[in-house]
Structures are given as structure tokens and as C-alpha cells.
Amino acid sequence: MVTSAMGPSPRVEELARSGLDTIPKDYVRPEEELKSIIGNILAEEKSSEGPQLPTIDLEEMDSRDEEGRKKCHEELKKAATDWGVMHLINHGIPEELIDRVKAAGKEFFELPVEEKEAYANDQAAGNVQGYGSKLANNASGQLEWEDYFFHCVYPEHKTDLSIWPTKPPDYIPATSEYAKQLRALATKILSVLSIGLGLEKGRLEKEVGGAEDLIVQMKINFYPKCPQPELALGWEAHTDVSALTFILHNMVPGLQLFYEDKWVTAKCVPNSIIMHIGDTLEILSNGKYKSILHRGLVNKEKVRISWAVFCEPPKEKIVLQPLPETVSEVEPPRFPPRTFAQHLKHKLFRKTDGDLDEKPTY
């Protein structure tokens, strides 16, 4: 179990429970961003107007029926190309296991703040794993309306169970099994996306680290009720640095995607996993697969919890750059070569060099 002093910002959970009517100014978004924030995301999620996040049925992803398999592969490729994010259904991970993961995470955040503080991270010392309220320096310098728990969950030899919650008792077994099954699903998805680029099916997995070096990390995001949701964000606009990101949530809306120059609210689809294409695959595919800008909204009425699992390449071993097969005279490389660590630094400390991977924020 890791202990450390809490940082200067109070836990958002404590702010929410204090009965305040207005949020501290450190949580208020910049003026130019406020005009796009919806105060009632719960009502917005019920709207059927505008574009809708695609739902991909994976039931026939490995089917012996060639027609069904090809149809599934094409739909997955199209969603990765057009949106870069999708709902996955019939993904093969048992509903009972997902329910256990959600229950364990919810129970952890229901513990008294004092108990959770025993798992607090120490960002000043470079230790981001554990319980916290701000993962890293973000783009705006503003605080986000969330607390979180962040840790490496796979492969087993790279995890540190000493920092995992021991309460509730099912947290470690449920999370470990979920990470293992999600890692296997990632292999299947990467195979389909490789084929979609005209590559051998194992190519993308190899390029992001393979069985030994691809790191799987989980961030449980806890978004308390917010008295002024029209002024705050749970997670500011960003793209994921990962190869793939898989997200569960407690069926409370909040995720928005920046699609066709406007913010689109993701629906709550039962028994689905949301999957994002991350920057890593966008770079390797030379932009053919999209890493979409997205953000998390909060609301007055309900606590929102999400479980984001990031599949990431090793920081220094691999140089990320467009694969030769994705480049031509007509489509020259859109991204400069960088290690994953260099890409992380590039993202965290703002992009000021006019790269083609720069994305709008609002």
C-alpha cells in the first residue's frame, strides 16, 4: 500500500459533499470554451438528432462464415477510419465479469476519503499510479471535476499489486481477470485493423510492443455531482496517446466526441464497451485511422464513473512513425518520428510547432 501527502488541491469528492453552490474558479473553464459546454448532459443524451456514435457487433469477428467475418471487419475498419471511436457489442467479455469490475470500483470510491488517501499518488515525485485528483499538467492549466485511481493492470510482471486496493476484496481478482480478457480482445482488434491497412494480421500488435511490451493501464474516473456543470469539465478535451482505449461506465452520460466540427454526445448502450483509436495507431496508419478529440462532461444529478483502459507501447523501445506501407508520394508522412515518451511530452507540454497532428480544442 502506498501512502503520500495529498497535493494542494482538495479531492473533488470533498468539494461536492461540502454543499457549495458555486465551484472554485480553478475549475471554471476558459471563456472561449464555456459556450460549447452543455449544462444538462442527461437531457442531451436522450436526443436522437445529429450524428450517432457507431455500434459494431463483434459476434462474427472470428466467424468461419467468410461473409459474416468480412462484414464485421469492414464495419470495424470504417468506424476506425470515419470516427476513431465506437460502441462494441458481443465483444466476448462476460457481463458478470464486467459487473464485478464496476462493483469493485464503485465500492472503492464509496470508501471514506481518509481510507482512499492511503493509496494517494505522489505526482511531484513522478509517481502517477494510485488515487489522485489531477493526473498531470493539462493543456488549460485549469482543474478538472474528477478524482481517479490509476494503475498498470497488465502484463502481470509489470504490475505492482501493493498499490492496488484491498477493499473491496474482489477488486484485485476482478480487475486482473478483466485486464487479461481485454488484452486478448485488443489482439483481435489489432489484427482486424492490420488487415484493414493491407498488412499481415500481427503487424500492428508487433509495432506497439507485442505480447511482452504492450502496457495496459486502467484509470477509474470518478465524477461527483457538480453544482455548476455548465462551467466545468470532468476531463478536458484531448486525444488518447494509446494504441487503443477501452471504456466502461455506469450508464450515466458524459462522453462527448468532436465530430464534423461539433461536439456529439455518446449514448449509453447497454452491455457495450466504448473503444477509442489512440494517437499511436493514428500515427502508425499515417492518419488513416482517427484519434478523435473527446472530453468528459459532468452533471448536477448523478455521479458518473468510467473505467478507461489504455493499451500503450513501451516508452523508449519503439519509434512511432507512419509505417512504410501507409506512405506514398500522394500521401507523404504526416507525423514526425518520436518515441512514445517523446509523444507524451509533446502532448503534455502543448503543441506549438504547427504539426499536422494538431487538433482543435473547442
UniProtKB/Swiss-Prot annotation:
Binding site for Fe cation: H238, D240, H294
Cofactor: Fe cation; L-ascorbate
Catalytic activities: a (2R,3S,4S)-leucoanthocyanidin + 2-oxoglutarate + O2 = a 4-H-anthocyanidin with a 3-hydroxy group + succinate + CO2 + 2 H2O
Pathway stated in the Swiss-Prot or TrEMBL entry: Pigment biosynthesis; anthocyanin biosynthesis
UniProt note on tissues of expression: Expressed in red but not in green forma of P.frutescens. In red forma, it is predominantly expressed in stems and leaves, but not in roots.
Region annotated Disordered, chain positions: 1-23
Gene3D superfamilies: B-lactam Antibiotic, Isopenicillin N Synthase, Chain
Listed GO biological process terms: anthocyanin-containing compound biosynthetic process; coumarin biosynthetic process; response to molecule of fungal origin
InterPro entries hit by this protein: DIOX_N, IPNS-like_FE2OG_OXY, IPNS-like_sf, Oxoglu/Fe-dep_dioxygenase_dom, Plant_2OG-oxidoreductases
Co-factor note (free text): Binds 1 Fe cation per subunit. Binds 1 ascorbate molecule per subunit.
Domain of life: Eukaryota
Domain Fe2OG dioxygenase: 214-313
Short name of any one Pfam family annotated for the protein: DIOX_N
Active site residues according to the UniProt entry: R304
Keywords (A to Z) from UniProt: Dioxygenase, Flavonoid biosynthesis, Iron, Metal-binding, Oxidoreductase, Vitamin C
Record-level Gene Ontology MF annotations: L-ascorbic acid binding; leucocyanidin oxygenase activity; metal ion binding
Family label: Belongs to the iron/ascorbate-dependent oxidoreductase family.
Biological function: Oxidation of leucoanthocyanidins into anthocyanidins.
Name under which the protein is recorded: Leucoanthocyanidin dioxygenase
